Swiss-Prot record:
Entry-annotated residues carrying 4-aspartylphosphate: D54
GO terms for biological process, alphabetical: L-methionine salvage from S-adenosylmethionine; nucleoside metabolic process; phosphorelay signal transduction system
Gene source species: Sinorhizobium fredii (strain NBRC 101917 / NGR234)
Protein name: Uncharacterized protein y4jS
One GO cellular component, as annotated: cytosol
SMART domains: REC
Alphabetized InterPro entries for the sequence: CheY-like_superfamily (IPR011006), Nucleoside_phosphorylase_d (IPR000845), Nucleoside_phosphorylase_sf (IPR035994), Sig_transdc_resp-reg_receiver (IPR001789)
Keyword entries, A-Z: Phosphoprotein, Plasmid, Two-component regulatory system
Pfam families reported for this sequence: PNP_UDP_1
């Protein structure tokens, strides 16, 4: 594996190399360039599996860094036939202006750009994901057979799935009170975390995974693979969702007792107009999961406790816990007419997300014994175009906290 770091800040290069060392990448595999011009020279002469670019970058030695330096290099790489394209590219910067100027170009090419700073850790997780993928590919190509790969995986009692590294996965790690260890397996590009959850005298083995991207497809594939490999008794998803305005408030929690794909159906023409005819399959939570959700929804003392212990921002009042249907769809919804159209599929529907049904369906179709599924999410917007980014951290915290309590009741009773 060969890695090219393009960065003129020595402090940041040292931090990046620290992550590479943790992933057991040797110094011989790492090349550092301090300008766009020197990086291009390296890319013309050699192939690199991973390219790490600083966004605030000078073009040549002696020139001042430019806010578009990293983006200009990315465009040059994609434009030229004289450059060997790396398999993966990751953008990093501590300059917020450069970050804002580069996000659109990076996302358009399906690459990530992350902020680096004293309190920022997402970039390290993202980099570790890339490294583990590349290492897994190398090991797989080193004649690891499928049976050898699968036999190295431990089984677990609980599998946690989060759609976002930050704030969802970081909140889950924080509230669990455990030391989560990064684990990887030969031939598998995924990165997992393993821990033992302690509930008094009882210990529950747990593995968590973060989706490579949001959405039903990523959630279904990731969950199905993890269920097959780790054989959990329970699959849990925590995080954030949109809620139905007027029936819930920002910060409220939804424990899903029913979920479906609201985009399942067909488009047809009626009197010259295109009409959508829904035909969803609805997956219901087990009676046992539903019972635990009902318990939590009535535990006002627990809700008040978690509200008071919340770090950082919190809503003006203690949130409510609703046990209700949660629909899923493949696209982010951001217009005020959305709920009025979808609620016809299930009049008690209270929220929407992009993953819950995929988790439920992966459990439904799993090899025997099929695991139960549990989805607990917090409302952070109303799918009407209004956003409050402050509430996302609280929503991730409160949903993860309640999920931990639910796991205790479901596994240890």
């Amino acid at each position: 594996m060969r890695i090219l770091i393009v960065d003129d800040e020595n402090t940041k290069v040292v931090e990046i190399c620290g992550v590479l060392r943790d992933a057991q990448i040797t110094e011989e595999s790492i090349t550092v360039a301090t300008t766009a011009a020197s990086a291009l020279k390296e890319l013309k002469e050699s192939y690199f599996d991973l390219l790490i670019i600083d966004m605030y970058l000078p073009n040549r030695i002696g020139e001042a860094p430019s806010l578009s330096g990293g983006v200009d290099l990315l465009k040059r790489i994609n434009r030229g036939n004289d450059v060997q394209l790396p398999e993966h590219i990751l953008g990093l910067t501590s300059n917020l202006e450069a970050l804002a100027a580069s996000e659109e170009d990076f996302s358009a090419r399906s690459w990530f750009v992350e902020e680096v700073g004293p309190s920022k850790t997402t970039w390290k997780l993202r980099l570790m994901e890339k490294l583990q993928y590349l290492k897994a590919r190398e090991e797989y190509q080193g004649n690891q057979s499928k049976s050898e790969i699968i036999s190295t995986r431990p089984e677990c009692e609980v599998l946690f799935v989060c759609a976002l590294l930050d704030p969802e996965l970081t909140a889950l790690h924080a509230v669990s009170g455990c030391d989560w260890e990064v684990v990887t397996f030969p031939g598998d590009p995924g990165i997992y975390w393993s821990a033992s959850l302690k509930f008094g005298a009882n210990t529950v083995s747990a593995i968590c995974v973060c989706l490579p991207q949001m959405g039903l497809v990523a959630a279904g594939v990731t969950a199905a693979k993890a269920i097959t490999l780790f054989k959990p008794k329970l699959v849990v998803m925590t995080g954030i969702c949109a809620g139905r305005k007027g029936d819930c408030d920002l910060g409220d929690i939804i424990g899903a007792n029913l979920t479906w794909d609201y985009g399942s159906g067909k488009f047809t023409e009626v009197a010259g107009a295109v009409v959508f005819e829904p035909a969803p399959f609805q997956a219901a939570a087990t009676a046992r999961v539903g019972g635990v959700l009902a318990e939590l929804s009535n535990d006002n003392e627990l809700l008040q406790k978690l509200y008071k212990e919340s770090p950082g921002y919190r809503p003006a009042k203690v949130p409510k816990f609703h046990v209700a249907p949660l629909a899923s769809g493949a696209a982010v919804q951001n217009h005020k007419e959305f709920f009025s159209g979808v609620v016809t599929q299930q009049r008690k529907m209270l929220g929407v997300d992009m993953e819950a049904f995929a988790i439920a369906w992966a459990c439904h179709e799993a090899l025997e014994p099929q695991p139960s599924w549990l989805v607990i999410k917090s409302v952070v917007d109303f799918a009407d175009g209004t956003k409050d980014s402050q509430i996302q951290s609280f929503g991730s915290y409160i949903s993860a906290s309640l999920a931990i309590y639910a796991v205790d009741r479901l596994i240890n009773r």
